[in-house]
């Protein structure tokens, strides 16, 4: 899976979990500030990313993932 495929899948997960339109999402979008996520939304999003990409994201790392690009980068690095 290449970076573009990971990005597309992350965008799809955000759309399904957070109820936003795909065209509202940018890589620099912050989950809370730009996409309206609360803490529960963010936890559910991290869990879905773990399931979809078969990666484990420890809580201390999850706390550092606050925007879309950080999520993509984390998954890309975890899949290396």
Swiss-Prot record:
One of its GO terms (biological process) is lipid A biosynthetic process. 4'-phosphopantetheine is transferred from CoA to a specific serine of apo-ACP by AcpS. This modification is essential for activity because fatty acids are bound in thioester linkage to the sulfhydryl of the prosthetic group. It holds the Pfam family PP-binding. The keyword Lipid metabolism applies. Its main location: cytoplasm. It comes from the Bacteria. The modification O-(pantetheine 4'-phosphoryl)serine is found at residue 39. One of its GO terms (molecular function) is acyl carrier activity. GO terms for cellular component: cytosol; membrane. Residues 4-79 form the Carrier domain. The keyword Secreted does not apply. This is Acyl carrier protein. It comes from Prosthecochloris aestuarii (strain DSM 271 / SK 413). The lineage of its organism: Bacteria, Pseudomonadati, Chlorobiota, Chlorobiia, Chlorobiales. The gene is acpP.
């Amino acid at each position: 899976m290449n970076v573009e495929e990971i990005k597309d899948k992350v965008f799809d997960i955000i759309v399904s979990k957070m109820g936003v339109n795909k065209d509202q999402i940018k890589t620099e979008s912050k989950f809370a500030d730009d996409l309206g996520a609360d803490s529960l939304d963010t936890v559910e999003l991290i869990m879905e990313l773990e399931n979809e990409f078969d990666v484990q994201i420890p809580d201390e790392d999850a706390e550092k993932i606050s925007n879309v690009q950080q999520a993509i980068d984390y998954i890309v690095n975890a899949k290396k």
